[in-house]
């Protein structure tokens, strides 16, 4: 079993897709280890996305991710990172396969409903950013 980190972004929350996305998580066989509903401060968004700090979209990304509430979750299942990436689809919803979360719920490349860790190493870092050990079950 492995872990991944997922986030329902501000557009996914605003457009009332949280229930459908959480249901999909369970349907796909993930165990929810931890779940939080919160609003990132701009500083927290900058810290979380610091890996992208040299990229031209960094400022817009941080402003967007701190613009409204999000849902953060730590999940577990076999091949968790890879499976979640398959479930959510391509970053650009125009390129996302039919039936993926982004094909169903994303508005744009930035407002694409969900985030998912891209490696086991990043999953561990991202889970620890949002959850203390006693907050995971």
UniProtKB/Swiss-Prot annotation:
Summary of the function given for this chain in its UniProt record: Major role in the synthesis of nucleoside triphosphates other than ATP. The ATP gamma phosphate is transferred to the NDP beta phosphate via a ping-pong mechanism, using a phosphorylated active-site intermediate.
Keywords carried by this UniProt record: ATP-binding, Cytoplasm, Kinase, Magnesium, Metal-binding, Nucleotide metabolism, Nucleotide-binding, Phosphoprotein, Transferase
UniProt catalytic activity: a 2'-deoxyribonucleoside 5'-diphosphate + ATP = a 2'-deoxyribonucleoside 5'-triphosphate + ADP; a ribonucleoside 5'-diphosphate + ATP = a ribonucleoside 5'-triphosphate + ADP
Compartments where found: Cytoplasm
Native organism taxonomy: Bacteria, Pseudomonadati, Spirochaetota, Spirochaetia, Leptospirales
Catalytic residues (UniProt): 115
Stored CDD domains: NDPk_I (cd04413)
HAMAP family found in the cross-reference section: NDP_kinase
UniProt cross-references to PANTHER family, sorted A to Z: NUCLEOSIDE DIPHOSPHATE KINASE (PTHR46161), NUCLEOSIDE DIPHOSPHATE KINASE DDB_G0292928-RELATED (PTHR46161:SF3)
One BP term from GO: GTP biosynthetic process
UniProt source species: Leptospira borgpetersenii serovar Hardjo-bovis (strain JB197)
Amino acids binding ATP: 9, 57, 85, 91, 102, 112
Protein's recorded name: Nucleoside diphosphate kinase
Enzyme nomenclature, EC number: 2.7.4.6
């Amino acid at each position: 079993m492995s872990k991944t980190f997922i986030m329902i972004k501000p557009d996914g929350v605003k457009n009332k897709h949280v229930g459908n996305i959480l249901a999909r998580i369970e349907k796909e066989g993930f165990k929810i280890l931890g779940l939080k509903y919160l609003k990132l401060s701009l500083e927290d968004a900058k810290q979380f996305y610091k890996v992208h700090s040299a990229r031209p979209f960094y400022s817009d990304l941080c402003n967007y991710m701190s613009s409204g509430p999000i849902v953060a979750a730590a999940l577990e299942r076999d091949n968790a990172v890879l499976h979640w990436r398959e479930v959510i689809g391509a970053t650009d919803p125009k390129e996302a396969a039919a039936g993926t979360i982004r094909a169903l719920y994303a508005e744009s490349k930035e407002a694409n409903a969900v985030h998912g860790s891209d490696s086991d190493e990043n999953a561990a870092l991202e889970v620890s950013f949002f959850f203390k050990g006693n907050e995971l079950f």
